[in-house]
Amino acid sequence: MDVGGALDLYGCSVNVYNAILIFIWVLFLWETYINLRQLKVAKRVTESPEEIKCLMNDVDFDKSRRYAIDKMNFDIVSGFYNILSLSAVLYFQLIAWAWHKSQEHMLFVCSYAPRSFGTTEGSEILFSLLFTVYVALFQFFESLPWSYYRHFVIEERYGFNKQTIGFFIKDRLKSLAVGLVIGLPIISMLVWIIKAGGHYFYIYAYGFTFVVSFIIMFIYPEFIAPIFDRYEHFPDCELRKKIEELAASIEFPLKKLYVVEGSKRSSHSNAYFYGFGKNKRIVLFDTLIKGFKMPGVEADSSANADESSDETQNRGCGDDEEILATLAHELGHWKLKHMTFNLIIAQINIFFMFFAFGQLINVDQLFVDFGFPPSTAPILIRLIVVFQFIFMPYSSVLEFLMTMLSRKFEFQADAFAVSLKSGEKLKSALLVLTKDNLSFPVYDWLYSMCNHSHPPIIERLAAIDAKMGKEK
């Protein structure tokens, strides 16, 4: 196979294809190495650490250990498949093949359409849209068996999966449809902006993505998330009153409080907030609250009887103060402006990537190695090659740094909850969630450093104790 020539970079001859292929395999081997380190820890440690024995006995610990081993083995095998698949895409120049097929099929369709429909000026956008659909369909079918195994074998084995096969397929199809409905217009506009924007197109492209990102941040929780899960206003009760008092005590502008029926798909629990300015919402998963029933569930309880179990009903925090402590942690992210900081970093990163793309867009040799002769690579392909492959080392380093920053933010949010006198309840809530989610509490330091955006439970408990000691 012809993989193109070499790129002259500051007097050095660099084969782009070989460099990318070497990097993705080095990255895969590194990730496999640290996964094997963690797998070794999970197999070696067979007794619950003293710090969490008060809640997780050896039986529960062994179950969490087996769960961790199963997930780790799955990640290693699926990772090996993914690297083989990506290598095949590069080696056989399948990106170019898919693009040419998109051209052929779109030209065939246009031959039966009005003459103006397939004009040369707009044809690249049409080709880009069909190419995107083909890639989305390929990824949909390629990931389907892996997702099925994760949910219906691993998650099912440990009592987490609550989806039926019908729900699973429908959920995946909805994700595909929503992704295309949102993604295709964005791709159309982005290709048009880059083609028409001249030398400073990267400024206009960044401005467009900036606006789109804020629009999506607004419409996703209000209009898109309810497509996948049922959201209800949190019922009037003592817990609701306490949550509103907590929000008011730190001047959090809470406008609405929701509960989401996460139990329909999984027993895992969560809580989060969203919104702009003085229009914030808090969302609690029904699985976070022990014994919680979604409004109206009694009316169809017989139909859903098989979807719930005593084990599921016994999961979650049974103490209101534990739930409040969990929310105090989440609201700490808002009070300490972590979300704003992350948003600023994201915008700087997007602008930098578009600026760098502006310097590389006309370096034809980058795209020859992907099967496109000089000056023939379309805009969308140039975006994919540069953003996904050329920037891969940069993106990997940035991802690691953001993981480290996230860990720091988690410690700070825990400390904020302690400052609200919720330290002990936060500890007990973390222990409950660790047990309920079968989170294996012992980690290899290198694996944890590279993979955990949230610190391990033992580190968090120690930090909370240290903070409470200083507060006394």
UniProtKB/Swiss-Prot annotation:
Alphabetical keyword list: Disulfide bond, Endoplasmic reticulum, Hydrolase, Membrane, Metal-binding, Metalloprotease, Protease, Transmembrane, Transmembrane helix, Zinc
pH profile: Optimum pH is 7.5.
Reaction(s) catalysed by this chain's protein: Hydrolyzes the peptide bond -P2-(S-farnesyl or geranylgeranyl)C-P1'-P2'-P3'-COOH where P1' and P2' are amino acids with aliphatic side chains and P3' is any C-terminal residue
InterPro entries in the cross-refs: CAXX_Prtase_1, Peptidase_M48, Peptidase_M48_N
EC category name: hydrolase
Binding residues for Zn(2+): H329, H333, E410
Cytoplasmic side: 30-75, 146-175, 229-340, 404-472
Gene Ontology CC: one annotated term: endoplasmic reticulum membrane
E.C. designation(s): 3.4.24.84
Details of cofactor binding: Binds 1 zinc ion per subunit.
Active site per the UniProt annotation: E330, D414 (proton donor)
GO MF term set: metal ion binding; metalloendopeptidase activity
CDD domains with a match to the protein in the record: M48A_Zmpste24p_like
Activity regulation field: Inhibited by ethylenediaminetetraacetic acid (EDTA) but not by serine, aspartic or cysteine protease inhibitors. Inhibited by high concentration of Zn(2+) (> 0.1 mM).
Subunit structure comment from the entry: Homodimer; disulfide-linked.
Protein name: CAAX prenyl protease 1 homolog
Organism of derivation: Taenia solium (Pork tapeworm)
Gene: TsSte24p
